[in-house]
């Protein structure tokens, strides 16, 4: 009930032609089988099979003043849905993406640089007994960036971007960012941008649940990072603000099917913070990290919290390494999370704390074995309604570096 089996294969090869040119090839193959959980013995068991293929060819040309990266990629996804695991598939579909991208950088001098990016992709989709015939879409974009570093303590970046999507109107986008090293212990980082996202094939055609009436999503966002450093300590504190028009969100509908829809206006603000400590002494290394995230994300029209966006999240990591052995611990607290915009406490996900711990042992030069206990305190918790995650479980791995 709810079992799954995932397999992934990766391969990568690179060849340096000369001092200026390098080519590389990377490929990933993935297969996954997911049995959806049932909540009573009378329900019919269902399953979902997905297959993914990714392949990327990369040509990197570099001189003292010029760097150009040209990429060609092919991506393919296929899914099969079985409304009864003992019968033939009831629906399915496949998507193919052909992609070409060129990233050109020119260094004018030590203070000024330019970046031009062009991209084109052809998207194709096909369905099986899902209401989808053959669909196809052309999309592309051009972007320009200017990087200016007037001094070692100050740098800025500004950019413009225009998307071109078949049958969809697109706005001109912009971004601006900068960093100021005020002194040796404090830095200020700021970012502001206008962003755009058009509905993907999954958003439009996924069956069951796709929505052909979706609008494109636009947003304005800004954040202000504050970085403090003292000896072995680093502290990052970043307030942020986001305003989104026609936000695309996948949520369960009245029939229990996950489906995307637009939310007219969403306003989100909050704070991200993280404290880090690193100390080396002899063969010893100690690391500690503690973070807190506060998010207030609401539908402006209803003034209610968005579902599946917790207000409070705390996370931490600690590790100690001596020579060839390392022990570590990871912890996360997730606050109360609403699962619908009516803010019903009865259906909200309860807050939870999960902790993992383990060790790594390095054997010889190229081998490392690891052991890990997940959900150490055997908590019962959910990140999605009605889908409880595993209780205490264990994992072992072997890492070989060639």
Language model segments and positions:
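Transmembrane beta-strands of outer-membrane beta-barrel pores
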Residues: 29-33, 63-65, 74-78, 120-126, ...
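C-terminal beta-signal and adjacent terminal beta-strands/loops
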Residues: 244-245, 333-340, 348, 356-402
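Repeated loop/turn-to-beta-strand initiation elements of outer-membrane beta-barrel proteins
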Residues: 19-25, 64-69, 110-114, 152-156, ...
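Outer-membrane beta-barrel signature, preferentially recognizing the C-terminal barrel domain
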Residues: 41-62, 185-187, 191-245, 251-280, ...
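Surface-exposed extracellular loop regions of Gram-negative outer-membrane beta-barrel proteins
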Residues: 29, 69-76, 82, 111-122, ...
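Outer-membrane beta-barrel "beta-signal"
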Residues: 177-179, 225-229, 274, 390-402
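Flexible loop and strand-edge segments within Gram-negative outer membrane beta-barrel domains
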Residues: 1-8, 14-97
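Gram-negative outer-membrane beta-barrel transporters
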Residues: 151-153, 241-243, 262-341, 365, ...
